[in-house]
UniProtKB/Swiss-Prot annotation:
GO terms for cellular component: cytoplasm; DNA-directed RNA polymerase complex; primosome complex. Belongs to the DnaG primase family. This is DNA primase. Mg(2+) 2 binds at D310, D312. Mg(2+) 1 binds at E266, D310. It catalyses: ssDNA + n NTP = ssDNA/pppN(pN)n-1 hybrid + (n-1) diphosphate. Its cofactor is Zn(2+); Mg(2+). RNA polymerase that catalyzes the synthesis of short RNA molecules used as primers for DNA polymerase during DNA replication. It comes from Staphylococcus epidermidis (strain ATCC 35984 / DSM 28319 / BCRC 17069 / CCUG 31568 / BM 3577 / RP62A). Pfam families: DnaB, DnaG_cat_HB, DNAG_N, Toprim_2, Zn_ribbon_DnaG. GO terms for biological process: DNA replication, synthesis of primer. GO terms for molecular function: ATP binding; DNA binding; DNA helicase activity; DNA-directed RNA polymerase activity; zinc ion binding. Keywords: DNA replication, DNA-binding, DNA-directed RNA polymerase, Magnesium, Metal-binding, Nucleotidyltransferase, Primosome, Transcription, Transferase, Zinc, Zinc-finger.
Amino acid sequence: MRIDQSVIDEIKNKTDILDLVSEYVKLEKRGRNYIGLCPFHDEKTPSFTVSEDKQICHCFGCKKGGNVFQFTQEIKDVSFVEAVKDLGERVNIQVDIGQNQTNSSTKIASDELKMIEMHELIKDYYHYALMKTVEGEEALNYLHERGFTDDLIKEREIGYAPDNSHFCHDFLEKKGYDIELAFEAGLLSRNEENFTYFDRFRNRIMFPLKNGQGRIVGYSGRTYTDQEPKYLNSPETPIFQKRRILYNLNKARKFIRKQDEIILLEGFMDVIKSDYAGLKQVVASMGTQLSQEHITFLQKLTQNVTLMFDGDYAGKEATLKTGQALLNQGLNVYVVQLPSGMDPDDYIRKYDNEQFLKFVQQDKQSFVLFKVKMYQNEINHNDLAYEKHFKETVRDLSLVNSGIIRNKLIQNIADIFKVNPETIQYELDATYQHQMSSNTYPTFQDEPSKQQLILGRLTKNEKAERALIKHLTKDKDTFLNYYQKIVPEDFTNSYLKRIFSYLYDYYSKNDYYTISDMMQYIESNELREVLIELDQYHLNDEPYENEIEDYIQIIKNNNNEDSLESLNYKLREASRIGDSELQKYYLQLIVNKNKNRM
């Protein structure tokens, strides 16, 4: 789908970022800018800044921000197209999809909207059947016995599908919906012999399943009798794919941002009861192992994931598998281990809400430590297992982002393996060296943008690269005068290299530079962060004679000895502050520099 650029520009020009952000954040004027508490993470000291002049916002804590479109995408967790439409409605501008959208794709979009409409219409019918009919009394009593109050049932829009094969079928038919489309939406089943349609869900308690925008896209029907299966979910449809659905994400999103943590539970019933008990940042996958799409959703919201699965064997195995997948993706992973045989509902019913919340807060441990404890018996009694788990643990420690947490883990894990902490640290350093020299650690190949904020000492070359890009963003004439004298490959900083490439594209379509407009050309959040940092980098308004030429010459010469000396200094500084990400990055650069000198 494509929206005409002139429409995008008109919407952006008519949307004042100060007015927009003020709907979500209480702002106070500080000098030329406005500042408030960040809406994307929990903080006590305001670090979220809005520039009315530049029409951008930026959080100096979590680094999120951008122009009006990027702010809307982040605050509402929607796509760029959806953000444009949303802001278009705000300023009374009609947003039409471009001509490249075919009639076929238009029909698909229309059908998907009708599928969602069907799900949301039948929801009210199901709810009425549960709360107001004799046939729904047994199901309602079952819910009451399980601790579901009428208020909770209403809040979660829970319903009942009667034991009638045409309850949903007849309702949708009377409303004028295509029965074939209702089948494709997963609300009906079909007899393949005579092609007759009947209700998929019968005699089940109905739990609506919503997408990230809060629209109902499927159902989970739970039996309250001996009927099998215990849970019957909607099939895979154009609007419902399990790999893309996290139950309760639409409701939990604001709490996840506030707490800077997401708690992943085993099932949606666990989520409902935990949320009702006061644990708000909870979600669950729909009976499937965590997909890459799920992990991507999580990474957009927070870097901290806590797993709280059932306290049985299957729950522990699922914790090991899921935790490893999350750790491998660079997330900070923690575990709350429920007592044997218990799920969250069991714990809440045995104790109370307050004790449950206290337990979750106090029993949290690093996934790496949980994993070692799970294999402690093998470690103590099997030499082969000891060596295998020792190597795995060292690798897992290399993935822990926080130096403080990693050092604490080393102390605890050393006791389990019955070695000195120095032994683990030695093996960990060797692992870093191997990963860097063999280029087997792709996660940290790009330069961490925060290195300029943490480590103040820049090399001569780094200063030149940053100053050059800053000058090239001042106006189009400056860019055109110098862009042919240097190529992206001359830059050592990967972010500045990419910004230089984007500037060429930007100036080919724009005569004047504004950071708000430039944001439209950049999809990477990290790159936007660097662009904002660069915007705050102060230079003289007018470069002195040959200043830009000097920067280009420095970049092309790239003094290796000066770079190596500075890199060693930065490696020591990164080690001192316990930042493993920076250690790995600078170690990689040192290895590469030494290779080039040989």
